[in-house]
Amino acid sequence: MPDPLSFRIKKQFDRYLHDPIMAIIAIPLFLIFKLLPYKFSSYFCGTLMYLIAPLTSYNKRVKKHLKIVFPKKSLEEINKLTSQHWFMLGQTIGEMPHINNLIKSGNLETEGLDRIKKGPAILVGAHMGNWEFLLRVGDLAGRRAGYVFRPINNWILNKIQIYRNKDANADFYRKGRIAAIGMASKLKNGEIVGLTGDQLLREGIMVPFFGIETPTPQAAAIMAIKWNVPIYMVRVERYKYSKFFEMDLSKMVFLKFTKKHIHLSAE
């Protein structure tokens, strides 16, 4: 069935007008952040997001979700968490041009990398702390990993994002069939793959999440069962003082499938 006319018009509008305009705004800002010291860039961008984001419609969405997660918190506490959320998101954006420098200067402490130095493994992370470090976990362990990514909704910025991560010593697979083939090939060859498990999806299995049926990605579990490969949860935590970030890998999780049950064990 052909796309509706309105969809085709919007697609052309985004490609030739909306996306270039947004790129013209974003690229100079990115270059400015890159020229600034990383601490100043982090704080400056965090402050910008802290001031601007509450004026957008996304602010109501954040508060709505926080109320679901923390139903007993007061409105004042929810507002405080919302402000902290926007500030940290701004910090992450301001730190993006400095990821390699943050690692080289010792601002990232790691724990558990020895667990993935040999053999196949599936790494599952989330958009926490500064998720840009997730793309470096394989390289930090001396391995060339394969990562699944969801393209940015801007074809120009998406190309820049891919180019920016060219030094991550990794292969990148666009979410979909290509990613499934790429991950399967990596695991069969005894290598490691990584993906984030908290992206908004319209597909997947429905799982209760804070009492709400939510589409949930299942690729990691399916691959782990099919090839008997361990899953490691990768967590990045942000600190205010001394060290800047810590990234650690959990104990390995094995999933074993029988006709009636899926058994989970940790080592």
Listing of model-derived features with the role each one plays in the protein:
Residues 2, 72, 76, 80-83, ...:
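Non-catalytic C-terminal accessory region of glycerolipid acyltransferases
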Residues 2-125, 130, 159-162, 169, ...:
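Membrane-anchoring hydrophobic helices of lipid-metabolizing enzymes
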Residues 31-35, 130-135, 181-194:
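Short, composition-biased local secondary-structure segments
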Residues 42, 76, 147, 173-174, ...:
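A generic structural-conservation signal
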Residues 60-61, 150-155, 214-217:
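Active-site metal-coordination segments of metallo-dependent hydrolases
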Residues 62, 134, 160-161, 182, ...:
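Residues within well-ordered alpha-helices
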Residues 120-177, 202-205, 238:
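Catalytic core of membrane glycerolipid acyltransferases/transacylases, capturing the structured
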